[in-house]
């Protein structure tokens, strides 16, 4: 019941034919395939770039010197009426 039955696919295809027309469907499928190929090639290129950009060994942690800061005193008491 949760999956698509064959008659669901028939309805979907009929809607596409009605919306786009029989002449435009091959062009739409061709452009969709071309877009998917471009998308996949970009994903592969990004993965290759990220793998080549990773250093082999992580950098050694650096020591950070800290200084003690004196505590601040209140500048002036509130002079609002109570």
UniProtKB/Swiss-Prot annotation:
Single GO molecular function: protein transmembrane transporter activity
Compositional bias segments (type: Basic and acidic residues): 68-82
Region of interest (Disordered), ranges: 44-82
Gene3D superfamilies in alphabetical order: 1.20.5.3310
Residues that span the membrane, as ranges: 1-21
Pfam families noted in UniProt: TatA_B_E
Cellular location(s): Cell membrane
Membrane topology, record value: Single-pass membrane protein
Top-rank taxon, per record: Bacteria
InterPro entries per UniProt: TatA/B/E, TatA/E
GO cellular component assignments: TAT protein transport complex
Key words of the record: Cell membrane, Membrane, Protein transport, Translocation, Transmembrane, Transmembrane helix, Transport
Gene Ontology terms describing biological process: protein transport by the Tat complex
Entry-linked NCBIfam families: PRK00575.1 (NF001854), tatAE (TIGR01411)
Protein family (similarity comment): Belongs to the TatA/E family.
Purpose: Part of the twin-arginine translocation (Tat) system that transports large folded proteins containing a characteristic twin-arginine motif in their signal peptide across membranes. TatA could form the protein-conducting channel of the Tat system.
Subunit structure comment from the entry: The Tat system comprises two distinct complexes: a TatABC complex, containing multiple copies of TatA, TatB and TatC subunits, and a separate TatA complex, containing only TatA subunits. Substrates initially bind to the TatABC complex, which probably triggers association of the separate TatA complex to form the active translocon.
Protein name: Sec-independent protein translocase protein TatA
Organism: Mycolicibacterium vanbaalenii (strain DSM 7251 / JCM 13017 / BCRC 16820 / KCTC 9966 / NRRL B-24157 / PYR-1) (Mycobacterium vanbaalenii)
Gene behind this protein: tatA
């Amino acid at each position: 019941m949760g999956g698509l039955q064959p008659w669901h696919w028939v309805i979907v295809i009929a809607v596409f034919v009605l919306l786009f027309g029989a002449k435009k469907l091959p062009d739409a499928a061709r452009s969709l395939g071309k877009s998917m190929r471009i998308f996949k090639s970009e994903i592969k290129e990004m993965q290759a770039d990220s793998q080549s950009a990773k250093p082999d060994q992580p950098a050694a942690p650096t020591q950070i010197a800290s200084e003690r800061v004196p505590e601040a005193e209140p500048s002036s008491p509130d002079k609002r009426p109570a």
